Structure formats: structure tokens, C-alpha cells
Amino acid sequence: MVELKFLIAFFLAFTAGILAIKLGQALYDC
């Protein structure tokens, strides 16, 4: 199923983006 792979890829990218933003804010606050 192509849709499932696309959904998983989107979810992983979205999660990675949020983690990157949180990490960036944490480093910026220090």
C-alpha cells in the first residue's frame, strides 16, 4: 500500500521536525 508508506514517511518527518525544533529551542535558551 503506497498510501500507508506515504503516511508513515510523513509522520516520521513531522515528528523529526518537532524534535529538531524543540532541540533547537533548548540549545538556544542555554
From Swiss-Prot:
List, alphabetically, the GO terms of the cellular component aspect.
Answer: chloroplast thylakoid membrane; photosystem I
- The main location class comes to plastid
Q: Which GO terms describe its biological process?
A: photosynthesis
Does the entry feature the keyword Zinc, yes or no?
no
UniProtKB keywords: Chloroplast, Membrane, Photosynthesis, Photosystem I, Plastid, Thylakoid, Transmembrane, Transmembrane helix
Per the record, the similarity remark reads: Belongs to the PsaM family.
Name the record gives this protein: Photosystem I reaction center subunit XII
Encoding gene (name): psaM-A
